[in-house]
Amino acid sequence: MTEAMDDVSCGSRYSIIEEDLVVLGESFGLGEIQACHFLPNGLMNGNWRLETPEGAFALKRIMDVPLPLARRDLAVLAELADAGVPVGRPMATSSGQTVAEVAGRDYCLIPWLEGGHRPGTELTLDQAADLGVLLGQIHRNLNDERTARLLPPASELLAAPVTTPHAARTDADRFLALIAALESPTAFDTEAAQALGERKVLLDKYAHFRPGTAVAAGPVGWTHGDVQHRNVLWRDGEIVGVLDWDRIRVRPFGEEVARTATVQFGGEDGFLELERTSAFVAGYRSVVPIPVPALADAVERLWWKRMSGYWQLVFHYDRDDHSCDHLFLPAERFLAWWTERREMVQEAFAAMP
């Protein structure tokens, strides 16, 4: 390498990869790797930007997905690129593989896409609609004949287990007990305990609104799994790239619409920007005419999932992984805001093109 590497470690989950770079450069035909920059925004995998004589590339160490699924997802990505979806086409090694293994560590490589991430409140209404159109196009392309050999047609019925209020309270009490047993609680521990107490109050007040069936409304099909501002690149007002394709799964389309909107236009700000949400939903419906009741079902299920789940605390206390700590308190504020305005939120998701 001709330039010193930036710090490429990030806690215990990422190894220093300098020893792997020579092999990766040879495998992918990159020549000498001139610089390697760690990208801290990825929450689940290791990501780096490589500068080489062949150009700039995004290198991902595959850590959060089984290798067979990663290979399938990379093959799907190539098909989507052929269909005109704004994605990077995976690079192949000298042996024709999209995954390179080095000392038991698996990597994939994609040409670097120039662009920036834009939180939802930075988007104009037209851009919010464009994002909805793109999500609709992704759903159409993931479920057409081009990808059928990789992603077999999905069933119209999909089980959607609903956490009981009792189970949600039990989980809250478990985390409260863990915090109470700490010898030296941190500021995060103190704030988490307060938030858990407030969550239990919400559970007591709104438990009777939990979804009554364990089957989600259709249509269902193959979905991206994490379309939101961290995984969408913009340049000159246009979407130029969709990233992070390692969560392709069969889900209700409405589930991904609801999740994308609440992460893109809310969540970290403590409220949902309803006008942009409506524009996004109308854009999506211009491509995929999902019925209003189906999307309403998805929105209610997502609300209850947030009400009854504590995934950031699972990471923090059960896995000793603090990488998502910063998401917990904003999510709690958003949940309280959403719970008090459930009808307004549903109206936003009923928008038509």
Give the residues covered by each predicted segment.
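Juxta-kinase regulatory segment immediately upstream of eukaryotic protein kinase catalytic domains
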Residues: 2-35
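ATP/Mg2+ or Mg2+-diphosphate-binding catalytic cores
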Residues: 3, 9, 173-178, 286, ...
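An alpha-helical support segment within catalytic cores of ATP-dependent transferases
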Residues: 16-26, 147, 173-224, 351
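ATP-binding glycine-rich phosphate-binding loop
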Residues: 28-52
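Active-site acidic catalytic loop and adjacent metal/ATP-binding pocket
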Residues: 43-53, 58-59, 90, 204-255
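ATP-binding pocket architecture of kinase catalytic cores
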Residues: 52-152
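A cross-family kinase active-site recognition segment
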Residues: 125-195
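Active-site activation/catalytic loop segments of kinase-like enzymes and analogous catalytic loops
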Residues: 254-289, 304-322
